[in-house]
Amino acid sequence: MERLQDVAGLGGYAMWNDHLYVGGTLYRSEHLGASQPNDGTCCGFNIRGIALYWRVAYQTSSENNNFEIGTYGMHMKSTPGAISGLEDSYTDWAADFQYDRAIPQWKNDVLSIRGTYILENSSLVASAAAVPPTAGFIGHHLNTVQGEAEYHFGNRVSTTAGLFSVTGNADPTLYPQAPVSGNLNGSPTSRGYILSVAWGPQQNIGLTAQYTGYARFNGGSTNYDAAGRNANGNNSIYLMARFVF
């Protein structure tokens, strides 16, 4: 499936009393380099009409503590490979929190704890009715849970450790067998951990190294793609350098 490459959005936000944040954005897509108006055949994925994103959060703080809890989500519809006809729809609901604690007795080091839960409900009417079908049935859901703890040593170095989990409906048509990206049993289940360290030698320079490890990937820990690949074959190291002028 070709991924959406061009999208425009218009949004706004408001903060009340330094505690309550409310924001929202409307998006729509239009693919360039194709016939206009867009007939949908240039790309495998289009936003049908308008996609809505929202965010509501509440934060409070004291001398050495800061706490935030919120919710966010998005709703959109798509007609795969077209601009009319049957639609697939997606609705994401999410909740998140973050707690930061400054530790004065340790030179104001900061401990941060973060967590996120996302529920994606999808109604794949168009995909299930396609010829050939790209989904085995209409109603699907995905659950994503992620939590992490980060420790800041002063304002130069920080380390992070986190866990993540993805579960949902098994559908061999939606998640077919294929080398590397494929799926032996049609399950989207993935689980793993993230470890990272960041260093800022100067205020405008940031260096980060992150390691992601998988215990399960696409429903399995061994031979998950029916081509002999194990979940830990997707373990990866990510390096980033940031310079601000």
Residue ranges and their predicted role:
Residues 5, 49-51, 90-92, 142, ...:
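Membrane-spanning beta-strands of outer-membrane beta-barrel proteins
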Residues 197-211, 216-218:
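C-terminal closing repeat unit and adjoining cap/tail of repeat-based domains
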Residues 32-88:
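Loop-centered beta-sheet repeat module
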Residues 11-13, 55-57, 96-98, 148-150, ...:
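Outer-membrane beta-barrel architecture
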Residues 1-5, 117-132, 170-172, 213-224, ...:
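Outer-membrane beta-barrel translocator/channel fold
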Residues 66-195, 199:
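Detector for outer-membrane/organellar transmembrane beta-barrel domains
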Residues 199, 205, 231-245:
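Outer-membrane beta-barrel "beta-signal"
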Residues 1-57, 230, 235, 242:
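Surface-exposed coil loops of outer-membrane beta-barrel proteins
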